[in-house]
Amino acid sequence: MLRRDSFTYEIQYTNAAEKFFRKHEDVREEYKAAIKELLAGDHPEKVDVKKISGKKSDYYRIRLGNYRVVYAVINGKIVVINTILAGPRGDVYKKMTGLK
């Protein structure tokens, strides 16, 4: 769990995301840095993030070079970033069709 000024946040990973990040630690570090940048609010425009439209409208994606990370934010006292998928662009969007 990480603290950021006045709130606490936690990044969680699904099994699929964890499997990807075990092979791509550099992308995991980029992702964590992007989340910190977004939450800090200093320069959120530096992070290429978009809300996903359609059935998965409560999901967001971060673009990290050729990779995409799909996540959802759960609010409360602790902000939980639930990392759903990570992988090459085409693979991530294909796998999203199987999400509930």
Which residues does each predicted region cover?
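Positions in alpha-helical segments
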Residues: 15-19, 47, 81
